[in-house]
Swiss-Prot record:
Belongs to the UPF0122 family. Transmembrane segments: none annotated. Might take part in the signal recognition particle (SRP) pathway. This is inferred from the conservation of its genetic proximity to ftsY/ffh. May be a regulatory protein. This is UPF0122 protein EAT1b_2891. PANTHER family: UPF0122 PROTEIN CBO2450/CLC_2298, UPF0122 PROTEIN YLXM.
Amino acid sequence: MTLEKTNRMNYLIDFYQALLTPKQRNYMSLYYLDDYSLGEIAEEFEVSRQAVYDNIKRTETMLEQYEEKLALFEKFEQRQQLLQTLKRQVELTDDVSATISALENLE
């Protein structure tokens, strides 16, 4: 599993956890947030490893479907990019203001 997928799933869990059942929330939290193995989760809940795997895969699919329809994560990423752009613009503005002040003080 790639770090990118793990990060994406962590965000999707954060955004859509209210739409999951308690069991789905538990499995996903343990697997993605707490880095439990399938075997450890299976042991904790006294179910088969395959049952945990199937539940996690179904839940991943559900989370992706929620994201397709609601786009909360996509909008979050867009807001973050716009915020970074705004911060850069403000920094540039501050730099320009400081330079103008320095020039004014030279006269």
